[in-house]
Amino acid sequence: MASPPDTDGFSDVRKVGYLRKPKSMHKRFFVLRAASEAGGPARLEYYENEKKWRHKSSAPKRSIPLESCFNINKRADSKNKHLVALYTRDEHFAIAADSEAEQDSWYQALLQLHNRAKAHHDGAGGGCGGSCSGSSGVGEAGEDLSYDTGPGPAFKEVWQVILKPKGLGQTKNLIGIYRLCLTSKTISFVKLNSEAAAVVLQLMNIRRCGHSENFFFIEVGRSAVTGPGEFWMQVDDSVVAQNMHETILEAMRAMSDEFRPRSKSQSSSSCSNPISVPLRRHHLNNPPPSQVGLTRRSRTESITATSPASMVGGKPGSFRVRASSDGEGTMSRPASVDGSPVSPSTNRTHAHRHRGSSRLHPPLNHSRSIPMPSSRCSPSATSPVSLSSSSTSGHGSTSDCLFPRRSSASVSGSPSDGGFISSDEYGSSPCDFRSSFRSVTPDSLGHTPPARGEEELSNYICMGGKGASTLAAPNGHYILSRGGNGHRYIPGANLGTSPALPGDEAAGAADLDNRFRKRTHSAGTSPTISHQKTPSQSSVASIEEYTEMMPAAYPPGGGSGGRLPGYRHSAFVPTHSYPEEGLEMHHLERRGGHHRPDTSNLHTDDGYMPMSPGVAPVPSNRKGNGDYMPMSPKSVSAPQQIINPIRRHPQRVDPNGYMMMSPSGSCSPDIGGGSSSSSSISAAPSGSSYGKPWTNGVGGHHTHALPHAKPPVESGGGKLLPCTGDYMNMSPVGDSNTSSPSECYYGPEDPQHKPVLSYYSLPRSFKHTQRPGEPEEGARHQHLRLSSSSGRLRYTATAEDSSSSTSSDSLGGGYCGARPESSLTHPHHHVLQPHLPRKVDTAAQTNSRLARPTRLSLGDPKASTLPRVREQQQQQQSSLHPPEPKSPGEYVNIEFGSGQPGYLAGPATSRSSPSVRCPPQLHPAPREETGSEEYMNMDLGPGRRATWQESGGVELGRIGPAPPGSATVCRPTRSVPNSRGDYMTMQIGCPRQSYVDTSPVAPVSYADMRTGIAAEKASLPRPTGAAPPPSSTASSSASVTPQGATAEQATHSSLLGGPQGPGGMSAFTRVNLSPNHNQSAKVIRADTQGCRRRHSSETFSAPTRAGNTVPFGAGAAVGGSGGGGGGGSEDVKRHSSASFENVWLRPGDLGGVSKESAPVCGAAGGLEKSLNYIDLDLAKEHSQDCPSQQQSLPPPPPHQPLGSNEGNSPRRSSEDLSNYASISFQKQPEDRQ
């Protein structure tokens, strides 16, 4: 370096020498001049070489006034180790020295002149301050100088960064080249070449920071002026990024000393876990600097934990130590967790401490809860909250993780964060939220007394390895088994000896230690278990394993309402267990010894839970649904594995391997409904052979032992309780508590025919009610009804397809299913089949394999929020008549139609035969049982048997679907009292039903593809040939085929072939589209008042009225969308189920109207005007079927629902009564009067 010349021209020169330009590495001759009256302000100049400077041959290449610099710092990058950087508002200028001594010499000289310049020009840059974090001496000098001038806070460091359009940079429009200026307490973003105000962030507001290659990021909390979020900055290279990271963390750590009491709220606010500034600071060395930033009082303790962690973090300097700063794993969790204030109060800290800095080795009981390797734990774990953070980079000490884990594991944020939950790999389980907050105070969070450790441990669900079986803890909490490694058996705690456990099962209790139970409440369990633990279990399970979350045992007897079984020791019984918590699903509870599942054989989960709208059967190879816990409304559904591991039969699995997400099947039982109406079931509270009344008091779930048990409909007052949950149960049907165990589904005699109850996932919940008309004896064989609304399981004829049970229920008793005898009024017939508890899929009656569910169930109006007009009425009459099934009417029952029972030709015809027989004109070739149509033909009524007015003994005649060619539609007038279209059956594929043309029947009349408004002999009294006058709204000409016409004629004459009886009633008119159109048909509910197409979500609440009013006007709309009549039917467009609007026309009802119905209709008319939505309350009042084959009908009650034949017609069996009432918005003339 050349010394400054003495000549006058160089009197102001303070330093000269050759330095390099960092980018080009070219040497230039630099001259540092002091301020002088002649020369001007202090400045740094450079010339191409010394010669030019001395000879003054040219002006300097560049001159930078020091007063314009707001900071001067030492720097280093990948190319130059010794840089001095000058930052101005507009640019960043750096010079590279060859050695550190040279760098320091220039730096000191620049600082001195810079501070003097600032003294004279206060407004220049805002203060240079500039000590580089690297040179303490300089830093001190720089700070002193800067503060002497007092122009503003000195910037300890300044970096030029490019803020990227990510996070807050984008939302706050902080994008472009900025200066990141660090002071002892703040970080500022100063826009380059702009007068915009700087964005100043308090170091305490920084949650965490980090760098990756040449990117550096800072995450700030809610207290920051910008709000919570991240700033991402790009710098020249990774060396600069690392330097920024280390320097800022150091500053945070330094500040932590001043703000050690930092408020918890802040630390919690640092939910993101990374660097709560205070945290980081204090562990700069060990903990990641970010942690250091947090100044927790607990810091000291957290330090103990963190320091090891920091080492784990990797670079000692790196701020990873602070778990949050690591951010790698814990980014999401709040930094506060780490050692943040969140960590309980200092005294709690002391408690920890006293426990030992051994925190790494917390008391055994605690450690037990923390079976993760210490290395895994992140320091953040120190605070219980931090628990989540522990999963972080694993920098934290084990002990920290452990403690917090057990206590408030579920809460990753500080208690103040209450809303913040983070689930760690370790299984802090969000679900445990309630328990985790036994008290918000940090103390409680941090560490409850060791005695409580067990309970706290149980607070967490142990996410145990798949292999481990779950045992019920005596306290009935969920026990999660960790991978089998290192589990210790806890001798005491009544685990092994619990009366509930059979001998070999008791042995399984040994696993108990490994599992963490979800404690229902913090204080629920006695401390005894915690002490029983064997020595350190902290290493019990490898953290790497995923653990299964499952309830420990089956719920005790139905009466318990999902609470712990009585035999459990009271000490372990949670005082206020939540239903899901109390529920013990484990097989151990099944004392009966029935089929104790072999836990070793538990199926491993394939990892996917099918969310398919259609059938989602459990894969055949999985007994239980593996590790998934069904998301049932009450959380009671447990993985199948738990419920009945061995009972899960592969046959139940859908060939497609989908798990059924049935809305209704998995409804959890009502808590109070536990009392089983069937005494036989209630006898076994714990579930001997699932003696537990899964039906929840409505339908006894009978084991094979109770083949004849019938669902005690009367137990509920004949009324199913509404399902308590508003949520659709998203669990495999088998898994839900309500769904009965597999044995319930299938008789032991035929295990291979064990289809899964497949339900379509519909937006609505479904309620399948017992058909009032069904004989109880027959009902229990008809099919297992899962009424989601009541959460109860109904046992009905097994002949019914499992999936069809839902739809058949909604349709009025499952008559749609392959359950030929279901509607029979001959109880003895049912008696013949006592062993039919197992359900047979409609599509696969002759096939052992499960076919896709044949129907969408329409039955449960549970979701309907509108008051039902008839609700009150039903309740009043429930004592006299079983409640009418409610049908939302929103979704079309879509039935694949395979294996539909043939129509009954006579009282006994095909009564017991589910075989399907299709006349050639109806069904060219027999369809395979499994049903090939991709979209379900909406085949709604084949199973339906109509009883006719003329005589109970008359054979039931059916008209096959008319060929599509016939376009004539009979539009019966509304005035026609009794003729009413039944359900529209849109059979898109070939019909499976066999039609028995035993007697001539009036053909179904079709109003434009609307479901047969069969004008077929609209009323018996009318002349057979008379055609009802078309309704005013009917758009298509009505033609009536004479009643005398043979069924075959009817088939050709009408598009919609519907089964019709001699009385002209069609159980279902059926749109038979040619098989090549496998499109879902769209049924539109015609709204004659305004023709507004009802959105599928709307619920119609129609006053019950005897079916004299029929929405024929609606028929036009149906025809329009449905494809018009005849050939139009070919054009059925696919519509999502949401677009289905159902017009249920019941031709049979058009015939004579009972006088009783008139007043009801009148009332209905008034209601129609007032109700925007009409909820069809379609429950039918059916008297129990008479044992005699005669179908004699007692006079129907005035409130008999729509669709039932009133007057002299014999009461229909439950099948006959349609679940949907015809909606008629126009009053018939007689009613209007």
Swiss-Prot record:
Q: Where is the composition biased (Low complexity)?
A: 264-276, 378-399, 407-419, 662-689, 785-794, 801-810, 1032-1042
**GO CC annotation terms, alphabetical:** ciliary basal body; cytoplasm; cytosol; nucleus; plasma membrane
Cross-link Glycyl lysine isopeptide (Lys-Gly) (interchain with G-Cter in ubiquitin): located at? K1180
> What positions carry the motif YXXM motif 7?
935-938
Q: Where is the motif (YXXM motif 5)?
A: 658-661
Keywords, in A-Z order:
Cytoplasm, Isopeptide bond, Nucleus, Phosphoprotein, Repeat, S-nitrosylation, Transducer, Ubl conjugation
The PTM entry states: Serine phosphorylation of IRS1 is a mechanism for insulin resistance. Ser-307 phosphorylation inhibits insulin action through disruption of IRS1 interaction with the insulin receptor. Phosphorylation of Tyr-891 is required for GRB2-binding. Phosphorylated by ALK. Phosphorylated at Ser-265, Ser-302, Ser-632 and Ser-1097 by RPS6KB1; phosphorylation induces accelerated degradation of IRS1. Phosphorylated on tyrosine residues in response to insulin. In skeletal muscles, dephosphorylated on Tyr-608 by TNS2 under anabolic conditions; dephosphorylation results in the proteasomal degradation of IRS1.
- Motif segment (YXXM motif 1): 460-463
UniProt motif (YXXM motif 9) ranges = 1006-1009
Q: Where is the composition biased (Basic residues)?
A: 349-358
Question: Which regions are flagged for Gly residues bias?
Answer: 1116-1129
What is reported when this gene is inactivated?
IRS1 deletion mice show impaired intrauterine growth, resistance to insulin and insulin-like growth factor-I/IGF1, and abnormal glucose tolerance.
Q: Where is this motif: YXXM motif 3?
A: 608-611
Motif YXXM motif 8 positions after renumbering to this chain: 983-986
BP GO annotations: cell migration; cellular response to fatty acid; cellular response to insulin stimulus; epithelial cell migration; insulin receptor signaling pathway; insulin-like growth factor receptor signaling pathway; lipid catabolic process; mammary gland development
Tissue note: Expressed in osteoblasts, but not in osteoclasts.
Residue(s) carrying Phosphoserine:
3, 99, 265, 302, 307, 318, 325, 340, 343, 414, 522, 612, 632, 789, 887, 1096-1097
- Phosphothreonine PTM sites in chain numbering: T441, T448
Q: Name any one GO molecular function.
A: phosphatidylinositol 3-kinase binding
**Protein name in the entry:** Insulin receptor substrate 1
Species: Mus musculus
**GN (gene name):** Irs1
